[in-house]
Amino acid sequence: MMQLKLEHYNIKIGQHKVLLNIVDAKELGVNPGDRVRIRGHQSLSAIVDTTDDMVPPGTLGVFTEVYEHFEDWDKPVEVVPSFRSKSAAVIKKMLDKKPVVQDEIKMLVSDIVDENLSDVELSAFITASYIHGMTDDEVEWLTRAMIDTGDTIEFDTHPIMDKHSIGGVPGNKISLLIVPIVAANGLLIPKTSSRAITGAGGTADLMEVLSPVEFSSQEVKEITEKVGGALVWGGATNIAPADDKLIKIEYPLSIDPYYQMLASIMAKKGAIGADNVVMDIPVGPGTKVPTVQEGQKLARDLINLGHRLGMNVECAITYGSSPIGRRVGPSLEVKEAMKVLESMEGPNSLIEKSAALAGILLEMGGAAPRDQGKELALETLRSGKALEKMKQIIEAQGGDPNIKSDDIQTGQYTADIFASTDGYVMEFDNKWIIEIARLAGAPNDKGAGVAIHKKRGEQVKKGDPILTIYAEKEIKLDNALATAQRTNPIIVEGMLLRRIPGTYGFQ
């Protein structure tokens, strides 16, 4: 045991970690990656790193996650070697493809949330599930543990409705229409959404154009019960916090383990008390689900997991080979969605998809008979009831309920991409559309993104603008434009694709 004084480094690193001078580490008999227990007015386990110059002997360097647990910073703390977390043994079992039990999964998720595992240990867990997969029981246990280790919302009124899109399609702004449509028909739909990680705008990024999106779980409940719906950022609610910690490791590895994805999606639905959930599964090249067959498997797995958790899940396999609507990027997409709410003016792909998925929820919730939900959704849009409900949601979340589509500002710097030939739009590259919008500044720069002037099958003439890039900063516009010119994300072909001459040519 050693008595050490504390020195705070005002940095959040996502885990309980401390710095020991190498002299003190040798005295304690610990190495980098080992654990120590810190005893002050409370006891805390932390992972060790060592240094020969950042902290002097007799001092324990602590980062913000540890700092927040202690109050008396003038008093020394006791530091003793600690045993490795039992979760490390569970992870090794998973790496060895050995079965685990529910209590082991619960302990593992608790250690993830409490930041008792190192990045190496988290990486091993992610790798194990990525390579070996998980059984149905293990996925259910993981989902339940993710729910139980975070905030939950318990509503007095049921049913609770929810919707989730698997993602991968640019411009998928449909939640901005679905939530007010469903809420306008007397159903509760507390939509917690993500911010974009690799996309040009998650639903939370979009809604932030209209109102604040960061609320506690209790505030989400109050907003939903007051106006029927909410569109908020899930990261502010502490719902399924284990998911955010796993994403931090998955992102640099560029992997998204299938069974962890299932648990992540369903944990967030379970935490808000959802009874009925519709899943949007876009399929096609460039999406997260390339084929209909893969979409059907994902649908079966989501429905099965929902059944195990007591949720009624329906899945919609949707067309994902080109953007939804004609705008990509927060302000551009919100402007497009608000125009639909205001006057039903907008791309058919946006209106049809939103009405179809909202219709499924209306049928699941008993607001519409079977096969009549879509028509009720369209009527809710046409009548202005969805717009009125959206205004109520915006106001309840602290925004201006009188905002109109024309009030929404887009990036001041623009550049066009022109068709290089007469012909028809044959193909979209979703990934490059998203990348161009991100290079322009989306989602952090709300006014950045792209406007798509011609969609698949539409005729163009040489010199017609087919894409406009919007940016708030000129240098970002230049970067996005250079990439668009290099990658050609919208393919235009003439009716004659290729001429192949005869073997002998003309005589």
Swiss-Prot record:
Molecular function per GO: 1,4-alpha-oligoglucan phosphorylase activity; AMP binding; pentosyltransferase activity
Q: Which reaction does it catalyse?
A: AMP + phosphate = alpha-D-ribose 1,5-bisphosphate + adenine; CMP + phosphate = cytosine + alpha-D-ribose 1,5-bisphosphate; UMP + phosphate = alpha-D-ribose 1,5-bisphosphate + uracil
What does the entry give for GO biological process?
AMP catabolic process; pyrimidine deoxyribonucleoside metabolic process; pyrimidine nucleobase metabolic process
Entries under Pfam families matching the protein: Glycos_trans_3N, Glycos_transf_3, PYNP_C
Query: What's an example GO cellular component term for this entry?
Result: cytosol
What's the top EC group for this one?
transferase
State the protein's purpose: Catalyzes the conversion of AMP and phosphate to adenine and ribose 1,5-bisphosphate (R15P). Exhibits phosphorylase activity toward CMP and UMP in addition to AMP. Functions in an archaeal AMP degradation pathway, together with R15P isomerase and RubisCO.
The protein's matches in InterPro entries, at most eight in alphabetical order, are given as: AMP_phosphorylase, Asp_de-COase-like_dom_sf, Glycosyl_Trfase_fam3, Glycosyl_Trfase_fam3_N_dom, Glycosyl_Trfase_fam3_N_dom_sf, Nuc_phospho_transferase, PYNP-like_C_sf, PYNP_C
Q: What taxonomic ancestry is recorded?
A: Archaea, Methanobacteriati, Methanobacteriota, Stenosarchaea group, Methanomicrobia
EC code(s) of this entry: 2.4.2.57
Q: Which UniProt keywords apply?
A: Glycosyltransferase, Transferase
What protein does this entry describe?
AMP phosphorylase
